[in-house]
Amino acid sequence: MDRRKRMQIIILLAMVVTMLVGCGKIDKTSETKENKEESLHTENVVPAYVNELIGIEKFDEKIDYSDSDNWMFLPEDISKPVDTIYLYPSAYGISGEVEDDIADIDDVNMRLMAIYYASSQASIFEESTNLYVPYYRQFTVNSLVDMIEESPESLQYIASRDIYSMLDYYFENCNDGRPFILAGHSQGSVWLTVVLEDYMEEHPEYYERMVAAYVIGYSVTDEYLERNPHLNFAKTSDDTGVIVSYNTEGPGNSEAYNCVVKEGAISINPLNWKLDDSYATNGVVDAKIDTKRGVVICTSMENTPEMKKALSEYFGEESLHLYDYSLYSKELQKNVADRINKYMKDNEE
């Protein structure tokens, strides 16, 4: 059975089991913030905010990324000259109630939802690259949003647990000097902003081989770029070593609270790859940058009443956050190939 057929079967099983699991509560013993035992870490080592998270002691155990069970995809057949590392969006606490703020690495529901997301998002990179998809311990949406807003300095500590360990393993054992792409969505893109700011600055020998970073579904801001002069935002369809980022909304979301849209956000139009407010369409969906809000406006689809209700608290009723990738999947797939071709041409020996 070839790899693509295996992937299709895994995805089908994931969707079926997710429906069977439904909204059942994960059966595990959990601490509360009031009676939680003190973390093995001290406040001198980690931000005080982190020690208030339910389940933070899980990070006292390091994930072994030499174990293939901690990867959704860990390719053995390296058939392409470029790799992609993809970090999936929020998958923990999506299909049912959970008690901890932080997932276990082998949380069944998280893994099933992660596979479901990867089937539509990570597959965009599979045609042009060797695809690496690690499992990592996620936060619930509400706990991550609270941490970003109340203690953004905690993000670096959290990323240094699983994400940095995974990157260390990948670069030391898997990469073999190949160019690479970083890709994520939503929570995955949150961690990519930390990786780009911190890990890549500490590892310029890796960063110089980065074709692009697709930080989609979370804001890259002017302030972020100003404090990180080693980073550059994409300006064209094929510049390399750059960040590609956007958030998609309907026109009625302009005044709504959206947890992934930050002040000073920048978006690139995924149809014409411009930063201005020029209108573009591929005949099916459209895109235009709201340069004031820093988002892509799409008028080609509308959320159902049920979806509007589900999105209203954290994203706004007309957020198209769930469709950031799927709306422009063909354009993204071509763009990946275009940037790779430009990188390879620029780096010919």
List PLM regions with ranges.
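N-terminal extension/subdomain marker
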Residues: E31-M113
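Active-site catalytic motif of lipid deacylating hydrolases and related acyltransferases
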Residues: V50, P89-R178, P305-E349
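Loop/turn elements at helix/coil->beta-strand transitions in domains of secreted/extracellular proteins
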Residues: K80-V82, E127-L131, D176-P179, Y207-V211
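C-terminal motif of bacterial Sec signal peptides marking the signal peptidase cleavage site
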Residues: M19-G22
